[in-house]
């Protein structure tokens, strides 16, 4: 698969026949075997890794979000990190409530681990700002958030952050894009068993300790705490996390700084990958 990119039909057959790809992917591809337009759309190009990372429809194919395109992007990031001499610092990983987000986070972590780069993975979904805090708190070289932000439910994405806690900017963005695009052979993409990675100290679950430190840091950012003390007891707040990641952390920080009357929209309280209340 190295060298000039195959045509879409060759790519389709490669994914269908090569032992590298799992049976679930092959079954999905077999089901579209008679749909030439769908095959072309899934394979006519590689899912673009841009300045914001990856974003695309979930499914099998080179132009889709799946474990293989996530691994490929992560291999490119790992190659860049190693060239920068940052592999000892590790990478923090968070994910949202979308379909496949936990799986994609794990695949990214295990690719990093296979490259000798420690992954710090949140135990459950977390908001993007906490990822920015975590990677700085842990002294990581980079961070990854599995999210597609405002896109429809059938989408997911992969955002890359650097050691300052912000999304990658010039010139690093283009340098990382180059490394990702240089990964042309899926067989060169590394991965490893999760238990093996954990035993080797290359996969660490993070959670409450980071949450607590994040909350304390948020409290330091309050500009007028005296005003909050005056109004918090009587003020009523209506909040909606829109079925995403904000429910627990937002309610926690509001409670801890004194707001007692916080009402969450019940239909949009729990994580929902289908975002069924939103048009």
Question: Where would I find each of the regions flagged by the language model?
Answer:
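Gly/Ala-rich phosphate-binding loop of Rossmann-like dinucleotide-binding domains
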Residues: 82, 109, 113, 255
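An N-terminal, well-structured beta->alpha segment
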Residues: 10-108, 197-234, 245
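Short, glycine-/Ser/Thr-/acidic-enriched flexible segments
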Residues: 21, 54-56, 61-63, 98, ...
């Amino acid at each position: 698969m190295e060298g000039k990119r195959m045509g879409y039909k060759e790519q389709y057959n490669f994914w269908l026949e090569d032992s590298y790809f799992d049976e679930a992917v092959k079954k999905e591809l077999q089901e579209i075997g008679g749909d030439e337009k769908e095959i072309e759309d899934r394979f006519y190009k590689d899912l673009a890794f841009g300045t914001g990372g990856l974003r695309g429809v979930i499914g099998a194919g080179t132009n889709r979000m799946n474990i293989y395109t996530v691994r490929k992007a992560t291999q490119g990031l790992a190659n860049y990190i190693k060239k920068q001499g940052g592999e000892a610092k590790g990478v923090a990983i968070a994910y949202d409530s979308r379909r496949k987000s936990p799986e994609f986070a794990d695949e990214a972590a295990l690719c990093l681990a296979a490259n000798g780069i420690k992954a710090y993975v949140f135990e459950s979904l977390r908001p993007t700002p906490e990822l920015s805090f975590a990677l700085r708190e842990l002294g990581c070289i980079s961070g990854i958030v599995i999210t597609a932000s405002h896109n429809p439910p059938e989408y997911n994405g992969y955002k890359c952050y650097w050691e300052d806690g912000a999304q990658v900017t010039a010139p690093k963005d283009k340098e990382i894009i180059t490394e990702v695009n240089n990964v042309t052979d899926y067989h060169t993409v590394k991965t490893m068993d999760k238990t093996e990675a954990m035993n080797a100290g290359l996969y660490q679950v993070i959670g409450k300790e980071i949450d607590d430190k994040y909350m304390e840091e948020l409290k330091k950012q309050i500009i007028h705490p005296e005003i909050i003390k005056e109004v918090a007891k009587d003020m009523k707040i209506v909040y909606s996390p829109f079925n995403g990641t904000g429910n627990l952390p937002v309610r926690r920080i509001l409670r801890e700084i004194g707001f007692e009357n916080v009402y969450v929209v019940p239909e949009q309280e729990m994580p929902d990958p289908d975002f069924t209340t939103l048009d």
